[in-house]
Every structure is written in C-alpha cells, then in structure tokens.
Amino acid sequence: MKLDISLFNSIAQQAKESPRLRMHYDLRDSSEENGQRMLNVLLPGTLENVHRHTNTSEVVICIQGKAIETFYDDNGNITETVEMVAGGECPGVVVEINRWHSIAPVDGPATVITTMAGKYDPESIETL
C-alpha cells in the first residue's frame, strides 16, 4: 500500500464531509492487532477535545502540512505548544502517558500518522 497524495486527498474529502472536519484511516491489518496506527487528516476548524491516554504514550508525526500539538496541565492551562511541520525541523512529538493534549492544523489541512501501543480502548481516554 502506498501512502501517497491520492490517498491523502481521498481522506481529506471524507473529512470535508464530516461535521468533525477530520477523518482517520486505519493502517492496521485488523482491529485485533495489539497496537494502533492511523493516518489522520485534520482540516481548519476541527475541534479536538483536550484528552489524555491513561495506558500508553502516543507518537504523532506530521507528514503533510503543519499542525500544533498543545499540552495542558490538570486545570486546562496551556503548558506547551509544539509546531510540527512535515519535512521540517520538528515533524513530530511523543505524547507521554497521562499528558493532556490536543492537536489542530495550521494554515490549511494537515496529515499526521499516529501510533499507540495496545488495542483501542475508549475507557483509557479521559477528556478534560
């Protein structure tokens, strides 16, 4: 499978049709795999809840466009922002276990690859 502009554009079209203005594409062979890896296309205006993962860290790498990962303390105050630029000086971040965070595109659409250990477990995601 090629991860090419045609695939990104197809996912972006689905994101445009989604009220959330984002769409993911599962890169796993099966939902039974003991790990998560996906492409996420984020469009301007998408809102992601501030959240954290209580059972795993998360790797986020921007492969198209620009995105900002924002980190928060337990009271919802911003503690750090990291601009991720595809092909740039800082294309990605590792979000530690239990670290509050959110992501947003900058200056247009952004495509990121996200990976996490373990099967998807909605019980392990908390929102602020």
Predicted regions and their residues:
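Short acidic-glycine-tyrosine-enriched beta hairpin
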Residues: D73-N98
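Short beta-strand His + acidic residue motifs that chelate non-heme Fe in jelly-roll/DSBH
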Residues: N49-H51, E69-F71, G92-V95, H101-V106, ...
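A short hydrophobic beta-strand segment most commonly corresponding to one strand
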Residues: V59, G108-I125
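Glycine- and acidic-residue-biased ligand/ion/polar-headgroup-sensing regions
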Residues: N55-N75
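Short, surface-exposed beta-edge/turn micro-motifs
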Residues: G35-R37, T56-E58, C90, P109-A110
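Conserved short histidine dyad/triad with adjacent acidic residue
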Residues: L39-N55
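A short, N-terminal "cap"/entry segment at the start of jelly-roll beta-barrel domains
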Residues: M1-G35, T81-A86
